[in-house]
Amino acid sequence: MKNKIKIRLKSFDHRILDQATKEIVSAIKRTFANINGPIPLPRKIERFTVNRSPHVHKKSREQFEIRKHKRLLVIDDPNPAVVDALSKVDLAAGVDVVIELESGE
């Protein structure tokens, strides 16, 4: 039976995301666990177009966008030391972390 831990990291700023990824990878490598990644996932770009004036000048518009960057880390056969190391990692405020546990049979 082979277990995996998948860690998905999301952020609006790619520099903060890369720094958080390096911190997690270094913490996991200290426990001598087998890690795959970081795997860069496709970024999602949301674009919004709004009128500059409320009533007239329909052709005058302004565009805004939000870029969401994502990374994936996969840990094969994690041991309790990996879980302990992950709980002690302190990340920046702009990074969203989702941890998934997969048990293979």
Curated annotation (Swiss-Prot):
One function term, GO molecular function aspect: tRNA binding
UniProt xrefs under InterPro entries: Ribosomal_uS10, Ribosomal_uS10_dom, Ribosomal_uS10_dom_sf
Record flagged with keyword Ribosomal protein: yes
Gene Ontology cellular component list: ribonucleoprotein complex; ribosome
Entries under SMART domains matching the protein: Ribosomal_S10
Keywords: Ribonucleoprotein, Ribosomal protein
Coiled coil feature spans: none
SUPFAM superfamilies reported in the protein's UniProt record: Ribosomal protein S10 (SSF54999)
Pfam families: Ribosomal_S10 (PF00338)
Example GO BP: translation
Quaternary assembly: Part of the 30S ribosomal subunit.
Similarity field: Belongs to the universal ribosomal protein uS10 family.
Function: Involved in the binding of tRNA to the ribosomes.
NCBIfam families: PRK00596.1 (NF001861), rpsJ_bact (TIGR01049)
Designated name of the protein: Small ribosomal subunit protein uS10
UniProt organism field: Rickettsia canadensis (strain McKiel)
Encoding gene (name): rpsJ
